[in-house]
Amino acid sequence: MMKVLVVVALLVTLISYSSSEGIDDLEADELLSLMANEQTRAKACTPRYYDCSHDRHSCCRSSMFKDVCTCFYPEGGDNKEVCTCQQPKHLKYMEKATDKIKNLFG
């Protein structure tokens, strides 16, 4: 049993060492250019209660959860769909509960 544990520990050490060597092979310039490309891809999020019909995955995050683009047909006979970023009620209650717990123990 002890031999098996030693072999497993040796394998884990070798695997972690080989993966860290691969990271060291990247040059700093390449890593910086990759990060710059990632930052340019980020787009502005849509605030709560604003129109999100142009991009339904663009809603901003609250302190804990991401808002959801909710679509509905308003009353009044107009059959045009309206979409806004909203926070679901169950997530709203969860955020309030965690805030109260943090204030109680924090």
UniProtKB/Swiss-Prot annotation:
**Which InterPro entries does the record associate with it?**
Spider_toxin_CSTX_knottin, Spider_toxin_CSTX_Knottin_CS
Disulfide links within the chain: C45-C60, C52-C69, C59-C85, C71-C83
Kindly state one GO CC term assigned in the UniProt record. Answer: extracellular region
The Gene Ontology terms for molecular function here are: toxin activity
Cite the propeptide residues by number: 21-41
Signal sequence, renumbered to the chain: 1-20
Instruction: Give the superkingdom in one word.
Output: Eukaryota
Location comes to: Secreted
Locate the transmembrane regions by residue number: none
| UniProt note on tissues of expression | Expressed by the venom gland.
Keywords, A to Z, come to: Disulfide bond, Knottin, Secreted, Signal, Toxin
Mostly located where? secreted
Question: What is the similarity comment for this entry?
Answer: Belongs to the neurotoxin 19 (CSTX) family. 02 (D7) subfamily.
- Anything noted about its domains? The presence of a 'disulfide through disulfide knot' structurally defines this protein as a knottin.
Name of this chain's protein: Toxin-like structure LSTX-D3
Species, as recorded: Lycosa singoriensis
